[in-house]
């Protein structure tokens, strides 16, 4: 009798789902791809591991742009090796650009890895994990071209209030320092209706802000994933008609979505930046007054060697036209120091363009030699000491400009979308963080808004996803400070969702079996039967 009851209890217990963790390296594209990986795994029955807990499946979504990305990945894989030996049932998967580049080399350097999948194989991850577990052998799947636009895949979004929306994947440019086109393939664009439908789905779940993603958003319209010629052969991109006004039209269409309060995009290419985009930014109220436009170098000679297809004069002209149309626009950029053959004169040209551009901030990088790129074989590779010294001078100039630009914000009233986990805050002041419409990070005092009656102030605690207005009281190079009382506080559905721990979901399921929940294991009771 006891044995029968015990067995019935064991059978009644639900199976324990396997847990997962996704570790992301690199750009916003990878961050969004990781949301898709999470969505796929959850649709297949896995559940996210608790913070600090060891996951049954660890997925690395990798970057191949810089050398330290390689070192970071293989270092982390080495740290997991002892656990893999002691817990052979746990699984390790490596995906993303580095997996696409290194392929079988991942298994040679880390033979304890279970799955290696490429940038075009995101949707295969749950199946590959199950196959590796069943066959007890590593699985490698690297496709050479995009077969299905990844935004059709389910995605478990990280934020309740802001979402990434891909408008294209791949790149048709041939920058000599960049390995991305060889890993992500030629550009393939989504149809506007598909993009807008995904945005609407996010807004319906309370999302207030979207960022449109593409390697070169200005080239949007060069091809469309739904074009029949691309379905037959993805290499046919050159023969697909292009709508050069498609991106500006897409921005304006975003302006017609009720409830969508903020639209951002990244990254445009200066060579294809057209005035219709500037006009759309200026005339569409929910398009944020912010522009991130990579410069890379201020030297025309180096830009030519980089194959960047524009020169410093054109770049500065775009900035002038943006600021004429949108006076309060915050402009940010990417810069590379120490490209092969860069002379002191070339570097000074970069400093001159940076000084003239008055960037709000800049992502600055020391040139990193990447095997497989034309720049890796160029003569004139610079000594590390020279690159480091120039890098420091560039940092000092941009830090001064960033501080001056932020100091000019003191006294202004800004609308903030309250965020979570943004930057360093002073715990003693209990500040929260938010992003202004121009993208600046603001640490603010979360005191009750002046327009709120006392009876509501306890209820109206500020939450990530809410919208507040406040006055800037201080500045640093990388953030603003607002220590006065809030002027207004608007509770939002995004704030409700964040407080409830809800995450937006997009994409469609693929009919993947629920492999994350294995058959129930035998239960040992207190009677040890």
Swiss-Prot record:
Residue span, MTTase N-terminal domain: 18-134
Residue stretches making up the Radical SAM core domain: 157-404
Annotated catalysed reactions: N(6)-dimethylallyladenosine(37) in tRNA + (sulfur carrier)-SH + AH2 + 2 S-adenosyl-L-methionine = 2-methylsulfanyl-N(6)-dimethylallyladenosine(37) in tRNA + (sulfur carrier)-H + 5'-deoxyadenosine + L-methionine + A + S-adenosyl-L-homocysteine + 2 H(+)
Enzyme Commission identifier(s): 2.8.4.3
Localisation per UniProt entry: Cytoplasm
UniProt-listed InterPro entries: Elp3/MiaA/NifB-like_rSAM (IPR006638), Methylthiotransferase (IPR005839), Methylthiotransferase_CS (IPR020612), Methylthiotransferase_N (IPR013848), Methylthiotransferase_N_sf (IPR038135), MiaB_methiolase (IPR006463), rSAM (IPR007197), rSAM_horseshoe (IPR023404)
Main location: cytoplasm
Gene3D superfamilies associated with the record: Methylthiotransferase, N-terminal domain, tm_1862 like domain
Cofactor(s) required, per the database record: [4Fe-4S] cluster
Amino-acid positions noted as binding [4Fe-4S] cluster 2 in the UniProt annotation, renumbered to this chain: 171, 175, 178
Binding residue positions for [4Fe-4S] cluster 1: 27, 63, 97
Domain TRAM: 407-486
Coiled coil location: none
NCBIfam families: miaB-methiolase, MiaB/RimO family radical SAM methylthiotransferase
Subunit structure: Monomer.
Family recorded in the similarity comment: Belongs to the methylthiotransferase family. MiaB subfamily.
Protein name: tRNA-2-methylthio-N(6)-dimethylallyladenosine synthase
Organism: Mycobacterium sp. (strain KMS)
Encoding gene per record: miaB
């Amino acid at each position: 009798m006891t044995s029968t009851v015990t067995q019935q209890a064991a059978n009644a217990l639900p199976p324990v789902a396997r847990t997962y963790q996704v570790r992301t390296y690199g750009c916003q594209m990878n961050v969004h791809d990781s949301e898709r990986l999470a969505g796929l795994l959850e649709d297949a029955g896995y559940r996210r591991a608790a913070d600090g807990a060891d996951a049954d499946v660890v997925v690395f979504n990798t970057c191949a742009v810089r050398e330290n990305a390689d070192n970071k990945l293989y270092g982390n894989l080495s740290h997991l090796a002892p656990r893999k030996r002691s817990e052979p049932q746990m699984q390790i998967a490596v995906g993303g650009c580095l997996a696409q580049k290194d392929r079988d080399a991942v298994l040679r350097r880390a033979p304890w890895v279970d799955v290696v999948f490429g940038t075009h194989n995101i949707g295969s991850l749950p199946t590959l994990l199950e196959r590796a577990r069943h066959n007890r052998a590593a699985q490698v799947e690297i496709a050479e071209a995009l077969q299905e636009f990844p935004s059709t895949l389910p995605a478990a979004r990280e934020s309740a209030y802001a979402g990434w929306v891909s408008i294209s994947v791949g790149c048709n440019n041939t920058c000599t320092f960049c390995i991305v086109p060889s890993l992500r393939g030629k550009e393939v664009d989504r149809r506007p209706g598909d993009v807008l439908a995904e945005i609407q789905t996010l807004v319906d779940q309370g999302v207030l802000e979207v960022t449109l993603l593409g390697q070169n958003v200005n080239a949007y319209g060069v091809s469309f994933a739904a074009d029949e010629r691309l379905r037959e052969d993805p290499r046919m991109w050159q023969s697909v008609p292009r709508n050069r006004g498609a991106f500006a039209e897409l921005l304006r269409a975003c302006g017609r979505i009720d409830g969508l309060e903020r639209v951002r995009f990244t990254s445009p290419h200066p060579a294809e930046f057209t005035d219709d985009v500037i006009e759309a930014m200026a005339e569409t109220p929910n398009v944020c007054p912010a522009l991130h436009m990579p410069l890379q170098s201020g030297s025309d000679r180096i830009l030519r060697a980089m194959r960047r297809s524009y020169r410093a004069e054109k770049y500065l002209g775009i900035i002038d036209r943006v600021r004429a149309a949108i006076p309060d626009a915050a402009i940010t950029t990417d810069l590379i120091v120490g490209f092969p053959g860069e002379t002191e004169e070339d570097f000074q040209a970069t400093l001159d363009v940076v000084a003239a551009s008055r960037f709000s901030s800049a992502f600055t990088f020391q040139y990193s030699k990447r095997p497989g790129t034309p720049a890796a074989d160029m003569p004139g590779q610079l000594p590390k000491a020279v690159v480091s010294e120039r890098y420091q001078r560039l940092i000092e100039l941009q830090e001064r400009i960033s501080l001056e630009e932020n100091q000019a914000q003191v006294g202004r009233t800004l609308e903030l979308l309250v965020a979570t986990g943004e930057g360093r805050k002073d715990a003693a002041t209990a500040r929260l963080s938010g992003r202004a419409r121009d993208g600046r990070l603001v640490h603010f005092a979360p005191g009750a808004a002046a327009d709120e009656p006392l009876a509501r102030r306890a209820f109206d605690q500020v939450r990530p996803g809410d919208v507040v207005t406040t006055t800037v009281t201080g500045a640093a190079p990388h953030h603003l400070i607002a220590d006065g009382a809030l002027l207004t506080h608007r509770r939002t559905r995004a704030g409700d969702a964040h407080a409830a721990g809800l995450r937006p979901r997009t994409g469609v399921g693929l009919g993947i079996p629920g492999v994350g929940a294995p058959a129930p294991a035998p239960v040992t009771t207190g009677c040890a039967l």
